[in-house]
């Protein structure tokens, strides 16, 4: 076990703060509409240019191990805020630095760090309640567009794309961001339920130009097993053929004699049919078959519940307005399932999301909610170069998360104004002792830091702007992009309440832990002896 280097008290804290300041100073230049870019070197390929705070934070590792500990703790602030709210990473870093730098003065003056932390926590609770109380719901197209534009660093086209996507697939729909192939941004929307399984045989395709099978008002048969014997399907096929409607079979697999007979009947026009493998594997396949059943009003034919395929009737089949099956995907549009049953199923899956601890499981469950509730939208990013593409994708991802947060908890005045206004909630607030009251005042001063940084990045004087904003009321603030004072909501400068709240909570949490740190321990690097020179070979000197 290697020897340890241990530092105590002020010498430990001063090293930690030095690391915090290096990371925070690199991150905070990106804040606001006039925030600057940060260029990150890559070991291969072109440098990465970004205005995304968490991307900058993740790249920083310091040589001094004590300073690096401070930097990594603040990096944790931006990562946590990013995970929960999807944006506000730079704001969180600026707040953490401000709380720490204000607090360390009091610790150095001999105040009790634990009481200071308790005071900060009391103040944070009051400010968070104020933010929640002043938040306005973001349920209209314009508000969503404005939040998206601001989070994408004032890029209005991105805001419009996200608002259009949310309008098309609903607030529960899945919206993904991909790299496009052209110069322009584009939006692709798949309405209805889509899953990644195509037709089992290309002979099921009835549109030869697109190689797809299009079924209008079809019946849907769901089977939780492999089908290889055509005798099992005869009853169902005869019943469907009499109606003259097409049939989609979704099963674990269709093979052998059953597949050959279906293909022949389809090609001869006796019955229009298409067979598709069920999506997913194992328990997830069973769950997705049940989702499709509820969406289309079908019953899953499963031997586990004592049902046999030979006895299936038209009552067990589901229906939909239209189904399109390609080589790789199946899209079910406007399933005839009961709306209440679908809503109950969505609630049930949401409850599973709350209980799940795996990020992968949560993502898959969220996809199932989207497929039942709305649809899937894909925003395709266009750019001239790969470097620009990556930078833009970072911004669009941020904007997408921010708009989701806005829909969830509403919006507040942007540009750091909501935090400055929340200072009023600290008036008359005192702690159990003088040191706790000092902790409350630490947050009172630190809470102005985001607005100061936005103004500073815009090249204006922070103190002048802070005083002017404090003199106003409500949503009155400063538009750093234009240099104009006015109502922030009317000017379209909004922040999701969830982002502002998360940034403050995480910043105060980590800054409080740092203030109460009294010792730091790290490994002492071992001096490894240099490799000896290689011995000389016959007729040669020693190689160096």
Swiss-Prot record:
One GO term in the molecular function aspect is:
isomerase activity
* Organism (species): Acinetobacter baylyi (strain ATCC 33305 / BD413 / ADP1)
Q: Gene name on record? A: groEL
Q: Which family does it belong to?
A: Belongs to the chaperonin (HSP60) family.
Q: What is this protein called?
A: Chaperonin GroEL
BP-aspect Gene Ontology terms: protein refolding
What is the annotated localization of this protein? Cytoplasm
A Pfam family this chain is assigned to: Cpn60_TCP1
Q: Which NCBIfam families match?
A: GroEL (TIGR02348), PRK00013.1 (NF000592), PRK12849.1 (NF009487), PRK12850.1 (NF009488), PRK12851.1 (NF009489)
Protein origin, superkingdom:
Bacteria
